[in-house]
Amino acid sequence: MKLKLIFKTIYADKDKTDLFYCVSKGIIYNKIKNKIVYQLKYTEIPRYFNFNLEFESYQSNKIYQSNTNTYKNTIIGSIYNLVLYIDIHNLFCDRFRINNKVLKILCYYLIIIQIRQLKTNKSYNITKENLPFKINDIINNPIQLIPWNLFLLGKNITLDLKNIKLVTNKQIPKKKFQKTGCIFESNNIDKLTHELRKKITTKSLIIIPTGFPKLWTNCSSITYTTYIDLVQLNDNFENKFKNKKMIHNIIVHECYIQYIPIIKKLIQYFVDCKSIWIINSLPLKYYISNDNNTEGKFTIGNVFKLANIWANFSTNDKKSYKTEIIRFIMADFNKLYFKINFPTDDLPVQIISPNILELNIFNEFRKFHMDWLSKLNNDKNNIYSSTSKHKNNRIKSKIYDCVMVLSLSVINNNDITIFFKNKIQKTLDINCKISKKIEKMIDVYISARKTSHHKINEKTPVDFTKIVNSLTQKKDKINSVISNYNRYQKNGFYDSIKDNDCPVCYDDDYIKTKLICGHTVCLTCVLNILPNSKGCPLCMEPININKMAIIRESIGESNNYSEMLDLLFKNLSNETLILTNLEETHNIMLYRGFNVWLLKCSFIAKKINFLSKITTVIILSSPLNSINDSDKLDFEMFQEYIKLVNPNISIKRIQLNIY
């Protein structure tokens, strides 16, 4: 019997690679390039282990064809696996007389495999059909940790990587998780709960946030708030749950990391509780956030706080099994976390026709985009001569975002100072923080230069003076930015800049665009400048679409400017929420006072009370034909989550019809 392990994955370019594995030398050779691709440190020992190069699959991508303006599914390469085969039968038979050198070599290769397992992306997805079997497997097979230095080779034998010896599996010390269960993530909690009720029904306690619907019938339930109140008021908790032995399952909805102490206290109270099930309606990153509604750090420590609900390790256990815990989270967290997605209904889409101004902006950006596409010839020897559908969709999404931002940046001339005020202050805050950090770094290096006894020479090439000078130059540049923006912040600054002919094309009848530096340039010139220099043509102040405003008075009737998009959002009530994945559009709408949430903000799901007061949700996203799969799934999950919290809410998608 042989154990098969993937030792290394090799990606080979199409038409440039013909791989060959030389057994005697332990090398993978590219015949076409006459080059060694990979070399093993030790050659194989066939009685105990051997390597084999095996074809896995072709790599393909949808590549743009400039001559037909279409995409063609093109093979761009191949994937090969260098597979390690371990003869378990021979190892077991020879375990008392095997050469120690063989074990050392095998340990070396298995350590590399373990390290690579930490970096490999895991699959967390399961299907509705596999859900009952997965639940049975979770209940009947509790998670257990084994020492990091032990590598299981089969049912009977294990290799001790630290002491370089073979041991039987009966000799392995194991640390079991005290509870069974897992975390389920789904885009439709109602349907998931319906499926789980078939397997987990009796003797269950349900923990839900305040305002969350009761999806479980014939089960006791409690909200986080109720439990906290009972504890703070020293109320008799036993009166609410008199028969604590009747609870065998605890089911937690929307488990935020700050609620973990509450859950652990409940687990300790219900001594007969065997399983804990967490059901989240959004990805895990949305539940790890700080109390001040800012995004928390997605760290191993935070993830293990969740895992320790089932493990229930003491402080000493955490110290003793620190390495094993890290390995579990990095390599085996898919034993505790599962995603199950259901089909969702398409949202109604309100199509808004672009006005002349929006079309002109779009056409200017599209001109550069199409010019770039037309020059792509898919040269095999030039990686920059082709583009994939995914990359091209990202560009389309960026252009769409730019059009939306500039359309919402049409401002009355008298409001320019107010319009730029928040933008300037934000830039000042960021640069001041960076300047202070650089000052601290300079102090550290100056201090190190004074205390160091090493002389600068070829053997010790750390030149503290050079580093300090480089940091000082960076600090001077940042201070220059701070000085400029302090000047821009002065009242009346934008009025002092004369608005004569466009200083670039000298046109006297143009749509005026005020830049954050105060200069006025025609819109066409700005849009032509952005793809190249990204700076004001007069003072070279860095600019982007967030650092400009289009003067409403300069548009004129000849451009047939319609404020349909602007009016649509202007007439929205406080009971309307805008959800978007367009970061720049989010920034401009936030400035203008809309209830707008950016899709990636981790604190969104915490505002259940706010969502209960909302009557309408508008989804403003990239065009449907260019939105990436990750954002599409996140929108679906938020859509179902919002409907779950507020069943009467109206959700629609608004899209500017330019693609």
Curated annotation (Swiss-Prot):
The keyword Metal-binding applies. SMART domains: RING. PROSITE patterns: ZF_RING_1 (PS00518), ZF_RING_2 (PS50089). Keywords: Metal-binding, Zinc, Zinc-finger. A zinc finger (RING-type) spans 502-540. The keyword rRNA-binding does not apply. InterPro entries: Znf_RING, Znf_RING/FYVE/PHD, Znf_RING_CS. It holds the Pfam family zf-C3HC4_3. It comes from the Viruses. GO terms for molecular function: zinc ion binding. Gene3D superfamilies: Zinc/RING finger domain, C3HC4 (zinc finger). This is Putative RING finger protein R311. The lineage of its organism: Viruses, Varidnaviria, Bamfordvirae, Nucleocytoviricota, Megaviricetes.
